[in-house]
Design a protein with these regions (language model features):
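A short alpha-helix/helix-coil micro-patch that ends at or immediately precedes a cysteine
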Residues: 30-78
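Bacterial N-terminal signal peptides that target proteins for export
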Residues: 3-15
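Loop/turn elements at helix/coil->beta-strand transitions in domains of secreted/extracellular proteins
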Residues: 53-55, 100-101, 134, 146-148
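Surface-exposed patches in mature extracellular/periplasmic domains of secreted proteins
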Residues: 54-68, 81-92, 125-141
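A generic alpha-helix surface/boundary motif
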Residues: 46-50, 87, 99, 119
């Protein structure tokens, strides 16, 4: 009987240790994913700002709070499997100092190719290079090998 209890305690200890390891890995994965999302967001904004600099436009400053919405929007598009614009962009910009807003959404195999496609599209290019814009919110999600991007511009 004592051997059975000792064995049960050892098994419970092993199970607890395994659970702790699995939970720690989940937390690490979440942190790594968040870190990767931030790097992708920063990279996409740098591509946009590089294009603006080549056309003597001011650098866009990132709105991190609005970027959470942009990320949510990108995730929705990836989940649904198609592109769509924010239904009411004005409501998302409420409370910000703005008079003009715009949005680019896209999906592509790389962020570089996606920025290139934006620059070849007249309405997207207009948003990227618009003088009145001074802020941007960026959301990037990778799903099934593709990058789903939402960039909200305002100024």
């Amino acid at each position: 009987m004592d051997r059975v209890r000792a064995r049960d305690r050892r098994l419970a200890g092993v199970a607890l240790a395994l659970l702790i390891v699995l939970l720690a890995q989940g937390v690490s994965a979440d942190r790594a994913s968040a870190s990767t999302d931030l790097r992708r967001r920063s990279y996409m904004l740098s591509l946009t700002n590089d294009d603006r600099a080549q056309h003597d436009k001011a650098v866009l400053r990132l709105n991190a709070v609005l970027s959470r919405y942009a990320t949510h929007h990108s995730r929705q598009m990836a989940t649904k499997g198609y592109l769509f614009h924010t239904a009411d962009l004005n409501s998302k910009l409420k409370g910000l100092d703005w008079s003009i807003g715009g949005e680019n959404v896209g999906v592509g195999s790389t962020l570089d190719s996606l920025e290139g496609a934006f620059m070849r599209s007249t309405p997207h290019r207009r948003n990227i290079l618009r003088t009145g814009f001074d802020h941007a919110a960026v959301g990037v999600i990778r799903s099934n090998g593709s990058f789903w991007v939402t960039v909200i511009f305002y100024g």
